[in-house]
Amino acid sequence: MREENKGMPSGGGSDEGLASAAARGLVEKVRQLLEAGADPNGVNRFGRRAIQVMMMGSARVAELLLLHGAEPNCADPATLTRPVHDAAREGFLDTLVVLHRAGARLDVRDAWGRLPVDLAEERGHRDVAGYLRTATGD
């Protein structure tokens, strides 16, 4: 193990870089790292996966991560929020659709009992809330 990776959750190097690139919405860097073998489910030094820290406004980053095997339903252990909660709260319909088509569940509650649709409605994202209601049959 390289010295700089000691004490880090599994991943370290390229997984840390992947999470960083995803958080910045750097599509080409994300693609390069994934093609070079970065683990799409590896965690950064904060214990977060790239799909959890990705720039929610970049549906293309989400697509790349998911195409390479990122888990769309990974939850934050403290808050139980999933990427769909984040996309709904911030109003990123394109990213939400990508996550949903990749198998993300829309019927899961966070630690406060809120569904993604609740977060979209709280923030006034009518298009997102409408999609979520239609997709869940409400």
From Swiss-Prot:
<keyword id="KW-0040">ANK repeat</keyword>
<protein>
    <recommendedName>
        <fullName>Cyclin-dependent kinase 4 inhibitor B</fullName>
    </recommendedName>
</protein>
<keyword id="KW-0677">Repeat</keyword>
<dbReference type="GO" id="GO:0005829">
    <property type="term" value="C:cytosol"/>
</dbReference>
<dbReference type="InterPro" id="IPR036770">
    <property type="entry name" value="Ankyrin_rpt-contain_sf"/>
</dbReference>
<dbReference type="GO" id="GO:0008285">
    <property type="term" value="P:negative regulation of cell population proliferation"/>
</dbReference>
<comment type="function">
    <text>Interacts strongly with CDK4 and CDK6. Potent inhibitor. Potential effector of TGF-beta induced cell cycle arrest.</text>
</comment>
<dbReference type="GO" id="GO:2000134">
    <property type="term" value="P:negative regulation of G1/S transition of mitotic cell cycle"/>
</dbReference>
<dbReference type="Pfam" id="PF12796">
    <property type="entry name" value="Ank_2"/>
</dbReference>
<dbReference type="GO" id="GO:0048536">
    <property type="term" value="P:spleen development"/>
</dbReference>
<dbReference type="GO" id="GO:0007179">
    <property type="term" value="P:transforming growth factor beta receptor signaling pathway"/>
</dbReference>
<feature type="repeat" description="ANK 2">
    <location>
        <begin position="46"/>
        <end position="74"/>
    </location>
</feature>
<feature type="repeat" description="ANK 3">
    <location>
        <begin position="79"/>
        <end position="108"/>
    </location>
</feature>
<dbReference type="GO" id="GO:0030511">
    <property type="term" value="P:positive regulation of transforming growth factor beta receptor signaling pathway"/>
</dbReference>
<dbReference type="GO" id="GO:0004861">
    <property type="term" value="F:cyclin-dependent protein serine/threonine kinase inhibitor activity"/>
</dbReference>
<dbReference type="InterPro" id="IPR002110">
    <property type="entry name" value="Ankyrin_rpt"/>
</dbReference>
<dbReference type="GO" id="GO:0030219">
    <property type="term" value="P:megakaryocyte differentiation"/>
</dbReference>
<comment type="similarity">
    <text>Belongs to the CDKN2 cyclin-dependent kinase inhibitor family.</text>
</comment>
<dbReference type="InterPro" id="IPR050776">
    <property type="entry name" value="Ank_Repeat/CDKN_Inhibitor"/>
</dbReference>
<feature type="repeat" description="ANK 4">
    <location>
        <begin position="112"/>
        <end position="138"/>
    </location>
</feature>
<dbReference type="GO" id="GO:2000045">
    <property type="term" value="P:regulation of G1/S transition of mitotic cell cycle"/>
</dbReference>
<keyword id="KW-0963">Cytoplasm</keyword>
<dbReference type="GO" id="GO:0005634">
    <property type="term" value="C:nucleus"/>
</dbReference>
<feature type="repeat" description="ANK 1; truncated">
    <location>
        <begin position="13"/>
        <end position="39"/>
    </location>
</feature>
<dbReference type="GO" id="GO:0071460">
    <property type="term" value="P:cellular response to cell-matrix adhesion"/>
</dbReference>
<dbReference type="GO" id="GO:0070316">
    <property type="term" value="P:regulation of G0 to G1 transition"/>
</dbReference>
<dbReference type="GO" id="GO:0031670">
    <property type="term" value="P:cellular response to nutrient"/>
</dbReference>
<dbReference type="GO" id="GO:0019901">
    <property type="term" value="F:protein kinase binding"/>
</dbReference>
<dbReference type="GO" id="GO:0005737">
    <property type="term" value="C:cytoplasm"/>
</dbReference>
<keyword id="KW-0131">Cell cycle</keyword>
<comment type="subunit">
    <text>Heterodimer of CDKN2B with CDK4 or CDK6. Isoform 2 does not interact with CDK4 nor CDK6.</text>
</comment>
<dbReference type="GO" id="GO:0050680">
    <property type="term" value="P:negative regulation of epithelial cell proliferation"/>
</dbReference>
<keyword id="KW-0043">Tumor suppressor</keyword>
<dbReference type="GO" id="GO:0090398">
    <property type="term" value="P:cellular senescence"/>
</dbReference>
